[in-house]
Amino acid sequence: MKQHIPNFITCLNLVSGCIAIVFAFQHELEITVYLLALSALFDFFDGLAARALNAYSVIGKDLDSLADMVSFGFAPGAIMYIVLNDLLLAQQLPSYLAYTAFIIPVFSALRLAKFNNDTRQSTYFVGLPTPANTMFFMSIPFVLAHSAINNTFVNSPAFLISLIVLMSFFMVAEIPLISLKFKNFDWNQNLEKFLLIGISIILFVILKFVAIPLIIICYLLLSIVSKKKIIS
């Protein structure tokens, strides 16, 4: 019985992601964001449950990737399609450019397939994880709604499409990135992880959802600076 508990939690991730996509295409992006945050929690707890119960299985691993493809692949693509389509129509630009948003699910699929077959990624990640990429893009509607940011270059479809291409590259790039899996809580061994958590908390308290892109950028920069320590 216990071996089915992680898979059940994974299925909750999948259901939450499916409902998030429905709300995205209904232009209810705030609800979409909260549902994807819920998916991320389920994604965290299914792994936690698998480790706690020693309930690992090949089916569980594949199911996790399939659920992630929906919640952290197609869902962020749907968000960016809606955002881009609205901006393109408002600025009287070709609406077909919004389809560039679906670069996200394509590269998410590549990232997940790579993760499933890469033995290096037990203690660190190689390339940006799909949940982190989803966090980045699910914050975009909040960033665009922020009064201090609206009507800046961030509101440009060209800028957002460039972000889609750049973040998709990071998902499949051969860049070692910090994993927040702790073997112990030794300060020296986990300095980068503690720094990342501390910076994230401070930024989120100050800026709320608008902080998420900055947190992901800090994550990438801190990982690149700490590359030698991560892979050692």
Please state what every model-predicted region is.
Residues 1-44, 204, 215, 226, ...:
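Topogenic membrane-insertion module of multi-pass membrane proteins
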Residues 19-35, 74-99, 140-159, 206-210:
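Helix-coil boundary and interhelical linker segments in multi-pass alpha-helical membrane proteins
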Residues 1-14, 51-69, 112-132, 176-191, ...:
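Interhelical loop and helix-boundary elements at the membrane-water interface
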Residues 9-12, 32-39, 100-107, 133, ...:
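Hydrophobic alpha-helical transmembrane segments of polytopic
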Residues 18-21, 38, 76, 106-109, ...:
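Alpha-helical transmembrane segments of polytopic integral membrane proteins
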Residues 125-232:
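C-terminal membrane-associated helical module and adjoining short loops/tails
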Residues 22-26, 80-84, 113, 173, ...:
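Membrane-water interface at transmembrane helix exits
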